[in-house]
Each structure stands twice: as C-alpha cells, then as structure tokens.
Amino acid sequence: MKEKFRCIKQEDRKKILLLCDDIRMHSGIGTMGKEIVIGTAHHFNWFNLGGAVKHPQAGKVLDMSEDVNKQANIEDSSVKVMPYNGYGDPKIVRDIIRVEKPDAILIFTDPRYWVWLFEMEREIRKSIPIFYLNIWDDYPAPLYNRPYYESCDVLLAISKQTKNINEIVLGDKAKDKIIEYLPHGINTDYYFPVKESHPDYNKFKEFKKKVLRDKEYDFIVFYNSRNIRRKSTSDSIFAYRLFCDLIGKEKAKKCAFILHTQPVDQNGTDLYAVREALCDPEYVNVYFSTDKLETAQLNLMYNIADVTMQLSSNEGWGLALTESLVTGTMIIANVTGGMQDQMRFSKDGKWIDLTPDFPSNHRGDIKEHGEWAEPVFPSNISIAGSPPTPYIFDDRCAPKDAAKALLKVYELGSEERERRGEEGRKWAIGNEAKFTAEHMTKSVIEVLDKGFDSFKPRPAYEFYKIEDLPRKVINHKLIDYSYE
C-alpha cells in the first residue's frame, strides 16, 4: 500500500456529513462525491445522506466501509450511506447530527436545493462548519445567491469562473471565507487511452466493432450528456449535418456522430425527429447510444471517438470533456462556464485567470488555447432567467461555427488528432490542470483541514442595526472586458 497523504487513524479523524446524490449512483454529482469519499477515506470519516428520486432503499443506513477499503487500499475506513428521497430536510439533518455527531457538513449541487439548510445555518454553525462544493454556470454574477454563499464557511469552486463569482457576490465578506479553486478530477484507473500495446486492446476492437455495427469510419464525433435544453443537443446534430455538407457526401459517408443520451426527454426534445428532419441518412450518419454503459465501456467510447463535442449554452463544468481529455481524445466546446478551463485559454503562454474586469472569455477576447481543443465562441449572448434565478447569460454558439470547428479537427488527420489528444491528456493529468481524482482529493484534504482549523462557531444571536438594504447592483464588467 502506497503512503497516503495525511493518513490519520480512524478514531482521530473528523467526520463529515456529505449531502449530495447517493455516492453509489452514476450521476455526475454521485460520481464526484464517490471519488472524494474514496480518495479521502484515510483522512476523514464519512456519512452520506444520499439523495435520489423515489429511492428504493430510503431510510436505511448502509455501511460501505468494506467496499471503500478495497477501492482505497486501506483497512479502516468509516463510510456510511443513508439513501433518501430528495436531498434532505431539517428534521433528518438534525437527527443525523444528534446520532452521528459529524464535525462538518459538506454540500454539493445547485444552491436552490439547499435553501432549507441555509435557513438553519446559524443553528448548525453554532457547532460545526458548512463546506460547499459549488458551481455556477454563467454571469452576470448571481447577487441573488449572496445569502447562500454567506451561509458557508468554505467555498470550493469547481471552475475558475465560479471562484470569481463567489468573490464578486460576497464582496467584502469574501475575506472571511475560504474560497479555493477545486476542479473536477477523473479517476485515471477508469479513464485512459487504449492503444495497441494495451492489454484491453482486443476488448476495445470487439467493442468498437459492435458499436459501429461492423462498419469502418474515418472520423467519429462523440456526445455524452443529457438531452436537455441548455446542452444544445439539437444544435450539435445540426452542426454535424452542416459539417457533412462542407466535406461532401462521399467523405461524409465515412464519418459518424454518436450521441450517448436519451433521444426523447421532456426536459429536452425529440432527437429522433430532429435527426429525421435535418439529416439525410444517405450520408449523414447520426447514431444514438441508449444502453446504460459501465465505466469501462464509456472509456472505450471515448477511445473510439476522434473528438468529443459539447455545445452547451450554460455549462458549469462539462464532465464529458474532462473524461475525453484523460483518454487522449480532442474536444470541441462552446466557450462558456467551466468548459473554458478545459481549453486552457492563455495570454503569452500563461493560463488565464478571471477577474471582475475579465470575468469570462465568452466574448472571444483571447484566442490562444490548448492545441487539444477547438473552441467555438458564442455568436449570441442573451439574458435568460426565472423567478428563483432572475438573470443569467445564455451563451449560444452558431451551429455553422461548430461545423467549421469539426472541419478543422477533421482536416488535421488521425495522427495529428492523436498527438494533440495526447498533449491534452498530459496537461489534464499534470500539476497545472490537476483534473485527476488524486489531485482533487488531495486538494479536498488540504482545503477542508484549513476550514476546520479556521472555523469560528457563530454566536447564538447577534445585534444588528436596522438600515435600508443596499441595492443589488452588478459591479463587474458586462461588456468591453479587459485582460491585464
């Protein structure tokens, strides 16, 4: 067993109540939650109130320690999961705190799911801190989230944009918080390149043959995400059709677009109808992968692909891009949210940071980027919203621009695509990007330890002078960005 970072005896560890998806689930949140738990089980003890819809095991407490021991290669983890319908409520959290006596709460997902928790934050923070692994898709900075951010002691920001947003929204109160960048990390034991020398190469060939139905293609585009509006799945199909027109029918016949998604979804659209309306089956090969894939199979899908495409108009991170990078596969993405991080936009070779004066690169001010990526800059930036989230930019790229990006990647040729994909993999798993589970969990330990050390319990009550509330005015640039 290799030496673990900051290994602590079980009886001396802090216990953390993790509120998120059931870590046994295959959702993005569940997967990242599981990686954090397994990668830190030698340093923290964990109790996961695991949310789901109509969970069949709701209310049971399951001891996962033995399974975690095997995966983490340790002998004394303490990991329990209590499945629950939804993400929890005040009563169940009070009960867990009373029985399990956690030293902190860590929450992970959209803040709107935690309003009930933020409303009881003083009750909780009299004794233990609240840590928040958070993300926000886009600007303008959500000033309506200020009470939520103020309710936390530590803010772990999944994207550079989110860290900037946390600091902008909190204003002067940011100095009283720990705010750190913590990008998603992929387990490189599960996602990796499968080349001819790899032991699984024969499995890969058989899987590829099955997926492609015994056909040979020169160029394969992959999409792995939900069929919901903000993912712009229909635009992706339209972009692929336009790409086929650019290269001509005969070359297009040797290309394919595979979408691993649910083709019909009430939160998205009917992709079968989109394909029928836009794609001539004679030369526009669009296929849907609808079977549930195990992680090993999904890794092979990324290895089959020449490029992974994600054109979301709002995207906090874009986990499919990260998975693609660590398998050595190039990416095409809309320049928005956390997808920008993965394209490594740079100025004079230095990876850019985001500030109030330069909150995003979605306006295309900086063109220098990692050679493993082909960015598509939004052609329209409009403001969408709803009563709970009154305003947020909707960064839509034009399908014709995405088609041109596909053409660029296609014209590179297979050897150059492979070389660039390998450069992306090296960067993603390296010490600058740190997009691996090992990097992520080490950072979790460092930041949460800092949070425990600096925690100051809130007093039972405070006196406030009643004054007019200040106007909630955006104080960062909305146009005419400047990067220094």
What residue spans do the PLM features occupy?
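Conserved donor-binding/catalytic core segment of Leloir-type glycosyltransferases
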Residues: 18, 213-231, 237-240, 257
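Aromatic "clamp/platform" in nucleotide-sugar-dependent glycosyltransferases that forms part
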Residues: 313
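Nucleotide-activated donor-binding/catalytic signature segment of Leloir-type glycosyltransferases, i.e.
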Residues: 80, 268-296
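C-terminal alpha-helical cap of glycosyltransferases
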Residues: 2-4, 434-482
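Carbohydrate-associated surface elements
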Residues: 161, 185
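A charged, aromatic-enriched C-terminal amphipathic alpha-helix characteristic of glycosyltransferases
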Residues: 393-401, 414-446
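N-terminal subdomain of nucleotide-sugar transferases
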Residues: 1-66, 70, 100, 475, ...
